[in-house]
Curated annotation (Swiss-Prot):
Record's protein name: M-phase inducer phosphatase
Assigned keywords, A-Z: Cell cycle, Cell division, Hydrolase, Mitosis, Protein phosphatase
Range of residues in the leader sequence: none
Residue ranges of every copy of the Rhodanese domain listed in the record: 261-373
Gene Ontology process terms (BP): cell division; G2/M transition of mitotic cell cycle; positive regulation of G2/M transition of mitotic cell cycle; positive regulation of G2/MI transition of meiotic cell cycle; spindle elongation
Catalytic-site annotation from UniProt: C320
Family label: Belongs to the MPI phosphatase family.
Biological function: Terminates the cell cycle delay. Reverses the CDC28 phosphorylation catalyzed by SWE1.
Organism for this UniProt entry: Saccharomyces cerevisiae (strain ATCC 204508 / S288c)
EC number in record: 3.1.3.48
Region annotation (Disordered) ranges: 72-93, 111-192, 449-469, 510-554
Length: 554
């Protein structure tokens, strides 16, 4: 026994074979307690195998023998008989020294197989490892039916990915021929729609709004480079625009302080039309609504026929009567619209420098009336323009509640077919229509026309044929008054008040009527005469209830 385990090549072969068995099967042979528990596996009878299984085993054995990682003496020992129990007992004492070398050899063998198929996924690697473990177990235990079944099952599983790979290759061929599956067609359609929408959005957003596409240039602020003295209003926290004094305005207009830094200087008068007509700064423009402001300074710049070749920006000076509310509000709206248009060119703008005239037109008129034409001053709350002031302020308040944002002002500012292009024409037509509507002369409604039964010749009222009596009894009927289209409803209601007796003698307690001669009637006042109160007919009662009147007479 000692000659078998010492100093021969068979000893080394047996040790290597047992190490492969321990690593692949993960059997507890390393623990001495479990040695005799696994001895029964060596005495199991060999199961019957088919010829197909034997051929597969022989092929795998040949492939394993031809591996470059195995030595010649190992291949010889694998073909030998299985070791006995004593050899296993002695092998357990020598396993600890050779575990490291065997692990390295086995890992190199598995690595060589994985390198041959680098495109396999993790599931294929696990199947390959199980296949290698089953291969080693079948080499050691060729008669075990359980191991052969697991080996054949692993081979059947390992063949499925190859079938899938062949089907994938056939699909690739079909795609090259132009036959695309429906799923890929839908995905390609979605991708094309997304790309088309992005292209349309970029083209739509860049074509109307890009200043360079229409020849419009945007500029940066150069107010700090100029010699214009400006300051900010500390009393109003919402005022973000610099302010200038009336003296600075005079120097800009007369001494051309901004000629080297600005292409031109424009003064915007935000007062109402009647204020501007009463007196304004020379060469100023009257704009008192947001629509007019957008049309003059945004639409004309974007959609003008002539290209803008200016290399310098335009300086804007905005004011109202006191430059406290209307002027700063319109200046803020213009800056907001300018920022929306030039959002891709931040911080450049069409009008980077906007100044507020501190004190407004009143301060200029008080200090430098020679700058005004005509040299007059009409206030907003002037007595002769109270109605116009109230109407214009209502419009201005409604406009101030609207905020210009990117969503609600994007197409309004950029569209060339905006109705604000015709703002001035429509405004002028509306003013002419209003003036023509108010040009008629006011005439009061005609006076009441009363029909009388008997009226003297000196009376101005309509009279019927005289019967010779001096006394007369006027007949007041609503039917005669309703026939006249000039009478109003209030006059009709006035007739109801005539039903009550408006004439009686306060001297007589019974209410006898006064008797007046016909000569006294000619003085101009109506005097109703009757000997008895019942003799006077009541027109409303007679017209509404004629039957009651006849009963009363009876």
């Amino acid at each position: 026994m000692n000659n078998i385990f010492h100093g021969t090549e068979d000893e080394c072969a047996n040790e290597d074979v047992l190490s492969f068995q321990k690593i692949s099967l993960k059997s507890p042979f390393g623990k001495k307690k479990n040695i005799f528990r696994n001895v029964q596996t060596f005495f199991k009878s060999k199961s019957k195998h088919s010829n197909v299984d034997d051929d597969l085993i022989n092929k795998e054995n040949l492939a394993f023998d031809k591996s470059p990682l195995l030595t010649n003496h190992r291949s010889k020992e694998i073909d030998g008989p299985s070791p006995n129990i004593k050899q296993l007992g002695h092998r357990d004492e020598l396993d600890e020294n050779e575990n490291e070398n065997d692990d390295i050899v086995l890992s190199m063998h598995f690595a060589s197989q994985t390198l041959q198929s680098p495109t396999r996924n993790s599931s294929r690697r696990s199947l390959t490892n199980n296949r290698d473990n089953d291969l080693l177990s079948r080499i050691k235990y060729p008669g075990s039916p359980q191991r052969s079944s697991s080996f054949s099952r692993s081979r059947s599983l390992s063949r499925k990915p190859s079938m899938n790979s062949s089907s994938n290759s056939s699909r690739r061929v079909q795609r090259q021929d132009g036959k695309i599956p429906r799923s890929s067609r839908k995905s390609s359609q979605k991708f094309s729609n997304i790309t088309q929408n992005t292209l349309n959005f970029t083209s739509a957003s860049s074509s109307p709004l890009a200043p360079n596409s229409v020849g419009v240039k945007c500029f940066e602020s150069c107010l700090a480079k100029t010699q214009i003295p400006y300051y900010y209003d500390d009393r109003n926290s919402n005022d973000f625009f610099p302010r200038i004094s009336p003296e600075t305005l005079k120097n800009i207009l007369q001494n051309n302080m901004c000629e080297s830094f600005y292409n031109s200087c424009r003064i915007i008068d935000c007062r109402f039309e009647y204020e501007y007509t009463g007196g304004h700064i020379i060469n100023s423009v009257n704009i008192h609504s947001r629509d007019e402001l957008e049309y003059e300074f945004i639409h004309k710049v974007l959609h003008s026929d002539t290209s803008n070749n200016n290399t310098l920006p335009t300086l804007l000076i905005i004011h109202c009567e006191f430059s406290s509310h209307r002027g700063p509000s319109l200046a803020s709206h213009l800056r907001n619209c300018d920022r929306i248009i030039n959002q891709d060119h931040y911080p450049k703008l069409f009008y980077p420098d906007i100044l507020i005239l501190d004190g407004g037109y009143k301060a200029v008129f008080d200090n430098f009336p020679e700058l005004c034409y005509p040299r007059q001053y009409v206030g907003m709350n002037s007595q002769e323009n109270l109605l116009n002031c109230e109407q214009e302020m209502d419009k201005f308040r409604r406009e101030s509640k609207r905020f210009a944002t990117k969503n609600n002002s994007f197409r309004k500012l950029a569209s060339p077919s905006n109705p604000n292009f015709f703002y001035r024409d429509s405004h002028q037509s509306s003013t002419t229509m209003a003036s023509s509507a108010l040009s008629f002369r006011f005439e009061p409604p005609p006076k009441l026309s009363l029909n009388h039964r008997r009226v003297s010749s000196g009376s101005s009222l309509n009279s019927s044929e005289s019967t010779g009596d001096e006394n007369f009894f006027p007949i007041l009927s609503k039917s005669s008054m309703s026939s006249n289209s000039n009478l109003s409803t209030s006059h009709m209601l006035l007739m109801d008040g005539l039903d009550t007796p408006s004439y009686f003698s306060f001297e007589d307690e019974r209410g006898n009527h006064q008797q007046v001669s016909g000569d006294e009637e000619q003085d101009g006042d109506f005097t109703f005469v009757g000997s008895d109160r019942e003799d006077l007919p009541r027109p409303a009662r007679r017209s509404l209830f004629p039957s009651l009147e006849t009963e009363d007479k009876k």
